[in-house]
Amino acid sequence: MTHYHFVGIKGAGMSSLAQIMHDLGNEVQGSDIKNYVFTEVALKNNGIKILPFDANNIQSDMVVVQGNAFPDTHEEVVKAHELKLEVIRYHDFLGHIINQYTSVAVTGAHGKTSTTGLLSHVMNGDKKTSFLIGDGTGLGIPASDYFAFEACEYRRHFLSYHPDYAIMTNIDFDHPDYFKDVDDVFNAFQEMAHNVKKAIIAWGDDTHLRKIEADVPVYYYGFSNKDDVYADNLEISEKGTKFDVYFKGEYFDTFLSPQFGDHNILNALSVITISYLESLNIDNIKEALETFGGVKRRFNETKVGNQVLVDDYAHHPREISATIETARKKYPNKDVIAVFQPHTFSRTQAFLGEFAECLSLADKTFLCEIFGSIRENSGNLTIQDLVQRIDGATLIDEESVNALEQYSDAVILFMGAGDIQKIQRAYMEKIGVTSPF
C-alpha cells in the first residue's frame, strides 16, 4: 500500500484521481484551500482527509501528486523535494496509470466531462471500467478491463497520455491565456493523435478534426450519411431521444437516450462507436444508455413548483448555446432564464462578443461578477463590459436573487465554472428549498 498526498486535492481531476487510488487500496490524503468546492463532497464521503496547505503535511513515506495549478515553489512541494520524495505531476501520474488497461481518452474543447461520464456508465454495463471524470468523480475497480478518462488539452497536458482509443469531440479556441489561436489548439490535437494506439473517434462536422492525420483509423460520427457512424430518424418524447445508428451506411441498431439536445446524441454516438469497435454486448450497452443519469454540474435539475433550476458548468460560448438548446428542447413551453458567471478575465476578454451573442438566446440574462482563477485573479475589463452588450441584462448577486422569483414558469440556468452555485444556493434558501449542494 502506497501513501499518497495530493497537492490541490479539490481540483476536479485531482479529486477523481485521489478517489481512484483510494479505491485501489492505497492510503490517500490531500490539501487545498478552505473555501467550499463541490468536489469535496465525494472526497469526504470516501473518508479521504482534506487538510489546509502546510509543509508539515508532507511525511517521509509519501508519494506526492502535484496539481497542475501549483508551482514547484509551493511550500508542500518544496518540502517533498527536501525529503527526496517522489513528486509527480497529475498528468504524468495519470499517464502511467492508464497503461495498465485498455484505455479510452475523451478530449475536445467542449463535451469532455459529459462524454466521459456517459462512456464510463455505458461501458460498465458490460465490462469492468475504472474511470476519471472531470466533474470530480473517479472510481477504481480492481481487475478492470477498461479505463475511461477525461484528457484536457490545456498546456498540452494530454500529450502525457498514450491511450488505446481517443474520442475527440471538437476543436475550438479556448484557454486564451495559453493557446495563441485555434491553429495552435489544432496543432496540439494533431500531436495527441499520434499518441493513440488503436483508433480515433471524431465529430465529423468539425472542419479541424477532418484534417487530423493519424497512424490509426479515424472514425467520424455525426448526423450525415457521409460520416462513418451516424444517427438518423430522431424521435423526441418525454422519455428522451430515440435514434437509429448506421455504421458505414448499414443499419446497426436503434437506441434510446434519456437526454435531449444534439450534442448529447453526438456524445452517445461516440460511445456507441467505442462499444462497437470493442465488440461489447449491444443489449447491455443499450440498457446502460437508457439509465444514464448525467454527470455533476451538467444540466443538473432541481424542480421547484413550475420552475426548473439547472446547475451547469457551461463557461464557453459554445457550451452556453448547447445548454440553452437543451432547455428549449426539453421544456419548449417554458421561458429560459440565464444566470451566468464569467470564468477568468482572459476568457471573458477573448470571447466578449461571443458571450453576448449566445446569452442573448435566453429570454432574460442575469450576470455575476467575473470569477478569477488561481493563476489570474484580476483584469482590465469588468462585468459591465458584458452587461452593455446584452439587451436587458441585469447584475445579480446573493443579495438580489429574489429577482428570479418573478419567472414562475421558467427554466433558470445557473451557468459557470467558478462559484456560481452560491447564487443558486442563495436563491433556494430565499424560497425555502433545501439546496442540493
From Swiss-Prot:
GO molecular function, one term: ATP binding
Catalytic activity, as annotated: UDP-N-acetyl-alpha-D-muramate + L-alanine + ATP = UDP-N-acetyl-alpha-D-muramoyl-L-alanine + ADP + phosphate + H(+)
EC number(s) recorded for this UniProt protein: 6.3.2.8
Biochemical pathway: Cell wall biogenesis; peptidoglycan biosynthesis
InterPro entries found in the cross-reference section: Mur-like_cat_sf, Mur_ligase_C, Mur_ligase_C_dom_sf, Mur_ligase_cen, Mur_ligase_N, MurCDEF_pg_biosynth, UDP-N-AcMur_Ala_ligase_MurC
Biological process per Gene Ontology, one example term: regulation of cell shape
Positions with a binding annotation for ATP: G108, A109, H110, G111, K112, T113, S114
Keywords from the named record: ATP-binding, Cell cycle, Cell division, Cell shape, Cell wall biogenesis/degradation, Cytoplasm, Ligase, Nucleotide-binding, Peptidoglycan synthesis
GO cellular component, as recorded: cytoplasm
Cited SUPFAM superfamilies: MurCD N-terminal domain, MurD-like peptide ligases, catalytic domain, MurD-like peptide ligases, peptide-binding domain
Family stated for the protein in its record: Belongs to the MurCDEF family.
Cited PANTHER family: UDP-N-ACETYLMURAMATE--L-ALANINE LIGASE, UDP-N-ACETYLMURAMATE--L-ALANINE LIGASE-RELATED
This protein's name: UDP-N-acetylmuramate--L-alanine ligase
